[in-house]
Regions:
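...captures the hydrophobic TM-helix bundle architecture rather than a specific catalytic motif
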Residues: 1-191
Length: 191
């Protein structure tokens, strides 16, 4: 279930992008259903955590191995990450549902819905990361998707300017986060 929660928005974004050739509505339905399914599973996961204390660390694969230094791509489920999964997934599902009507006039709806699903996947990655390197990649994914969503109407100069400003501000945060991760590795030998 933990793997499904993390990867459903990514799979929904990919399928939504591919099936847009059959019509905008299919892309909207797929991305919204996949994110909504992740929201339902997040609520179940949260319930299992509260009632059965069903928390854990779920390894996806070994990412980096160099001597004694090993970094796994893992899903860490604890009380904080489970409640954040519920918050992020419910808000994202509601935004997806609202966007179906809000973007009804736009010919690029499938692209917007795919960006939203990718944003949800990046937020999930950020929330359930087991180490600082994975957290950094989730942070970068959120920054990239923010840039893409802010600059969605790229033909408008104001949207492009706002996207570039957001991108620059995110780079400042990235720099600070990267320095912090480097210092943690330098002093503790682990991330």
């Amino acid at each position: 279930m933990e793997y499904a929660i993390l990867f459903l928005p990514l799979i929904g974004a990919l399928i939504g992008y591919v099936i847009k050739v059959f019509g905008d509505i299919y892309s909207e339905i797929v991305t919204t259903l996949f994110v909504s399914a992740a929201a339902i599973l997040s609520i179940i996961l949260f319930y299992n955590g509260i009632v059965y204390e069903d928390y854990g660390n779920y390894k996806i694969y070994q990412w980096i191995a160099s001597g004694k230094f090993v970094v796994n791509a893992s899903i860490n489920i604890d009380p904080l990450s489970s409640i954040m999964l519920v918050v992020v997934s419910l808000v994202s599902a509601l935004v997806h549902i609202y966007s179906i009507g809000y973007m009804s006039h736009d010919p690029d709806k499938p692209r917007f819905m795919c960006y939203l699903s990718l944003f949800t996947f990046a937020m999930f990655t950020l929330v359930v990361s087991d180490n600082f390197l994975q957290l950094f990649f989730g942070w970068e994914g959120v920054g990239l998707c923010s840039y893409l969503l802010i600059g969605f109407w790229y033909k408008k100069e104001s949207a492009n300017d706002a996207a570039i400003k957001a991108f620059i501000v995110n780079r400042i945060g990235d720099f600070g986060l990267a320095i912090g991760i480097f210092l943690i590795f330098f002093f503790f030998g682990s991330i």
